[in-house]
Amino acid sequence: MVTRLLGRKMGMTQIYNEKGQCFPVTVIEAGPCTVTQVKTKDKDGYAAIQIAFGVRRSKNISRAEMGHIIPKGDLKPEDRKKAFDRQLKETKNAPEILREIPWDGKEDLKVGAKLDVSIFESYKKVDVIGTSKGRGFMGVVRRWGFHGLPATHGQSDRERAPGSLGRQHSISQGVPPGKKMAGHWGVEQVTSRNLDVVQVQKDKNLIFVQGSVPGPTGGLVLVKESTWTAPKPSTVVSKKTKAGQIVKKGH
């Protein structure tokens, strides 16, 4: 069963429910995606499929990737190059992105099969993976929420400075690994988990999810079945309680 689709963030809007309450939703164009490769446990050691989404000019794609997309057929090796060159000239468009997704191997999927947004009609919650917006080079105050140094008592230009970076005369001298410092912010993979599916429009390949989705308008995203579960509160057995009685940690 296929539980993931490539898509594009179209933007945000508002929707009213049956009670007249207004809440924000993100519109995602999920699919249609074309199956470009099928992997099985017998041949490849694991089951997965490769799907393609979007359209871009074939002149902007490498010859090796075009050879992966264009079917080779049952031609002889000496005839494949001529046939490939002919198909390469005839092919004007190519997929914008290729992505391999897990697959249980139970369905009879073949190369060229189409996958649309209808696979999410039975889902109540989904996860959306995207790339966050790039914010450029940021200081520690905006990037990490540092408080900054005092604005008075003799200082002149250290209000937004990070302060000390490490100790000099100690065993762990120098800047410790993972120290929060100024640097590039954004352009990272971000996952929005457990988003409610508000509406699915199969004819337009649109899915409406409640809340925000990472990335700019027009950015590529991956929509998948939500597997997130709320963490359970940690519990410990107190020595003062009776045997078998569980109390919450910190109580």
Regions found by a protein language model. Give the residues of each.
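Extended basic (Lys/Arg/His-rich) segments that typically form rRNA-contacting surfaces
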Residues: 1-251
